[in-house]
Structure formats: structure tokens, C-alpha cells
Design a protein with these regions (language model features):
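Short catalytic/metal-binding and nucleic-acid-binding patches
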Residues: 1-158
């Protein structure tokens, strides 16, 4: 069995009240959540069935996890960005358990329509929001992500 090194910062309290910028990637960077359609002056994401499930589950996060609020999010063809606000959580709830349950819930629903689908890359990326300026920067990044798709570091021509 392969022992993966955790990307989580050792000794950091991921159950503490903070805001996190989270990125969840699709397995092998597959474009399975939707596609970007170019309009005259902007781009638009057209969600696939799986992308709609992912969006539905994002909107349910706060009802499944007390103290969790998704401030902003964007579903892209091969990844998702979220700004997640955590109030002080119970010891069994951390950012990792919340994201893990989200990924499991989306996968479970998606596999009903697409049996055997390997939807997600292992783990996820996170950034602790440090101040108001950092929050504004990441919030704008999320809002502009669809329009900047061709310049995005996760962009892979489908």
C-alpha cells in the first residue's frame, strides 16, 4: 500500500474558525463537470449532469455541517474552487472531513448515473485566508475564473 504524504500543514488546527480557499480537482483533470462556452464579451460555464450534482451538494454543505458556510464557489470543467467559512467546529469536523464528505456525496450520486466513475483526484488544495485583502483577492479569482479559463493553471484543452 502506498503511503501518500498529506498536503495538510502539520500541527495546524483545521477545525478552527477561519476562511479557506479550497480547490478540488477531477481525476486526471477530466473535463466532466461542464464546459466553457465563449460568448461575445464573456465566457459561461455550461454544467454537465455531474456538474449540477456538484453544485447541488455545495449548496447543501451548510445544512449537513453546522458552522460551515460556503461564501463563494465556482464549478469549472475539471475543478471546483470554494471559499469556505468555518466557525468553531466539533473535534470530529475538520476541513478535511467536510471536503471528504462533500466529495463522497457527489461521487455517490454521480455513480448512480455513471457506474465506476472515478471522479476526484486524491485530497484537495487549501489556502488559509489571512486578512480582508486576501479574501477579496480569492473572491475575485473565483468570480473571474470562468472568463479567465484559457489562462487558468488547470486549463487543459479538451
Amino acid at each position: 500500500m502506498l503511503n501518500r504524504k498529506s498536503p495538510r500543514m502539520l500541527g495546524f488546527d483545521f477545525a478552527s474558525a477561519r476562511i479557506y480557499f479550497v480547490t478540488i480537482n477531477c481525476n486526471k483533470s477530466q473535463h466532466i463537470l461542464g464546459e466553457i462556452v465563449k460568448n461575445e464579451d464573456s465566457n459561461q460555464i455550461v454544467l454537465s449532469e455531474i456538474g449540477m450534482i456538484a453544485t447541488e451538494k455545495i449548496n447543501e454543505l451548510s445544512s449537513h455541517h453546522a458552522g460551515v458556510e460556503v461564501l463563494e464557489y465556482v464549478v469549472m470543467p475539471n475543478h471546483i474552487h470554494m471559499l469556505i467559512s468555518l466557525q468553531k467546529l466539533v473535534k470530529t469536523s475538520t476541513l478535511s472531513t467536510i471536503v471528504g464528505s462533500y466529495k463522497s456525496g457527489v461521487s455517490r450520486m454521480a455513480r448512480q448515473a455513471f457506474p465506476g466513475l472515478e471522479l476526484w483526484q486524491a485530497s484537495f488544495s487549501d489556502h488559509v485566508i489571512r486578512d480582508e485583502n486576501d479574501l477579496l483577492t480569492h473572491s475575485e479569482y473565483i468570480r473571474m475564473n470562468v472568463d479567465r479559463w484559457q489562462k487558468d493553471k488547470y486549463f487543459i484543452k479538451a
